[in-house]
């Protein structure tokens, strides 16, 4: 297939990694890439084809999220621009059409492939994915999913296209419904369900800032102690509900629908399958989806360079199911005790403690975060060597099953396992890589670990999880490794799951600031750092500073005092922290 004499333009953002990848494909076929939006509209460019990112096109081939499209494309008026596109007769198709052209070795598209610029109406699903917590009004990003046009005639169309509101509130049998019989405020639960979906949608698509806006709005709704009756009421009475989100809330309450929410459900599922694998981020997942890869098996055959570049994906694939299973607090504590026992034999003075969601009182944890420190030791290189020695011992003892970051010493110990995974995956080309370790000295260690059968039996005999302060709402069942990908599976068949374990370290003098940082949550850390900045301070994991002068780093409570804050226990740094500090 030759594309010589063909012109293509990428919108709204030609500089994303996936678009750069597609640009290189087209250029190799002889195509010319139009870099300027204005060039698209010149009479001499009538033959240009505009390629629009799939995330801006719904299942009915309508352009959606025009406000976001306008911002990312750097346009002053998106409607005026689209009008000129239509007048000039320029054809617009989805970026994923490139995959079809390459596979068929033919440049051709049908009328059904052309993008329309009128919005479509989509019903809110009654199946809400779980999201998390909250944002400041002033930092809210416009996150409109629906069309800018919300007149009465459009609302009538939306009502006709929707399921009955009662149906939305009841939910499907076997699925988590938006509202339960115990719910006091039904409007709120309906809104929360939609915000969860929006949060998850943008998380999966790698849109961190938009996801954060919805998380924070969702948290405000969860903390709300009255039944929200309008978007305006939510905007004026609740934090983190800006005009954009208030507008959506009003549409939800009026009609039970939110245009654009479900148009990418299929895409979300495909991206989620890849993103749930350790080592795979949004960009890789999007690229593989655009190339029509539906399994790791296909990706390994057609894009082996990605696995060679980041070999940890092989272990994310191998332990896919295990690493999606959460563990009890008792199991976290059992892992801590095992590490502490081994550590005493290496350096009795060095100490280690649990951080993360365990420290915040969660009943279930996705992984284990351990913080290492040593009284009066401010040499993190010394701590790094202690952790490396500990890792070597625990690997030889059979506790560590895989490393996800290497030093030269760990590479010598573990390289055979990496090679074995490449061979099992039938990936070639790894022999050309000369070095597998990331650095001579690393101060963070990531790994997969397993308890012994005896420890697992002892764990089963424990009755209650001590220290549980927060029981999360049930999430939907996570994805499972597809049958075509099972040949790489090292997942447990006896219930003894491989667990993700992370080692961190901090200087003795920075212990207080380090504990704040590694306890989390991410939203709490962001909030307290913004608050510190507003008061003229700078807070990091290394301490509290003013004018680059360290004020406090060791005493955690003193840091709160200097910020004029009441000390927040770790369990108060979860989703309810904002309500307590408002």
Curated annotation (Swiss-Prot):
Known catalytic reactions: DNA(n) + a 2'-deoxyribonucleoside 5'-triphosphate = DNA(n+1) + diphosphate
InterPro entries (alphabetical): DNA-dir_DNA_pol_X, DNA_pol-X_BS, DNA_pol_b-like_N, DNA_pol_B_palm_palm, DNA_pol_lamdba_lyase_dom_sf, DNA_Pol_thumb_sf, DNA_pol_X, DNA_pol_X_beta-like
Give GO MF terms, alphabetically: DNA binding; DNA-directed DNA polymerase activity; metal ion binding
Q: Which CDD domains match?
A: NT_POLXc
Could you tell me the keywords of this UniProt record? DNA damage, DNA repair, DNA-directed DNA polymerase, Magnesium, Metal-binding, Nucleotidyltransferase, Nucleus, Transferase
Cellular component GO terms, alphabetical: nucleus
What is the regulatory mechanism acting on its activity? Stimulated by the interaction with the DNL4-LIF1 complex.
Protein location: Nucleus
- Cofactor(s), names only, from the UniProt record: Mg(2+)
Q: Region (Involved in ssDNA binding) spans which residues?
A: 360-369
Q: What class of enzyme is it?
A: transferase
Positions of the UniProt region annotated as Disordered: 127-161
Query: Which Pfam family, giving just one, matches this sequence?
Result: HHH_8
**Where do the annotations place Mg(2+) binding?**
367, 369, 502
Superkingdom of this protein's organism: Eukaryota
Which E.C. number(s) belong to this protein?
2.7.7.7
Job of this protein = Repair polymerase. Involved in gap-filling in DNA nonhomologous end joining (NHEJ) required for double-strand break repair. Seems to conduct DNA synthesis in a stepwise distributive fashion rather than in a processive fashion as for other DNA polymerases. Preferentially acts upon short gaps formed by the alignment of linear duplexes with complementary single-strand ends. Required for filling gaps that need removal of a 5'- or 3'-terminal mismatch, however lacks nuclease activities.
Subunit-level organization: Interacts with DNL4 subunit of the DNL4-LIF1 complex.
| Name of the protein this chain belongs to | DNA polymerase IV
Gene symbol of the encoding locus: POL4
